[in-house]
Amino acid sequence: ASDCLVSVRGDSVLIVLGDSPTTHVPASKHSGREATAEQLVDQAAMQVAGSLGGSAVVGPVVPGISHAGRSLRSALAGLRALPGWAEAPNPVHADDLLPERLLAGDELAGEQILHLVHAPLHEMGDPFESTVATYLALGGSLEATARNLFVHANTVRYRLGRVSEQVGWDATNARDGLMLHMAIIVGRLAVSREA
């Protein structure tokens, strides 16, 4: 990072990293500047977490300084919600703590779940969203989901696989399933507020 701002807040160290457009970024397997910036932030977070000996929560990479406050708020909300996920890696991304943040009352988490998880799932269409919702509501049973939706179990597998590929969250994984379940609930609540 070409710019760095460090601040101490209570027993927390806040670090905001900045990058100029002319900074050399090494090639990576990920495409796009955001993926590369996220890799650099992850590397820095690993070093900071290791040297400080405490928990590290990484806010999302944002396009500019005008959005840095949002990233910082996400990271601070993640730090407050971190005790809710005992198995969280260190460092952990604030967006990976969205369910805990939402339960802790973080309104920004609700917006982010709608944008990052629910919107892509909803855009896939009702068969995919209802398959995920039914699968999670029935405790992860492929057969019960297939019976409930009047489709073959392979159709359920296919739909869940497509959701995993397109949305990035796998309903068959307990942690990802929690994220998807929260996204479906938040999406339903958003629709009911609009009605």
Task: Give the role of each language-model region.
Residues A1-A195:
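Cytosolic nucleotide-utilizing catalytic cores of signal-transduction proteins
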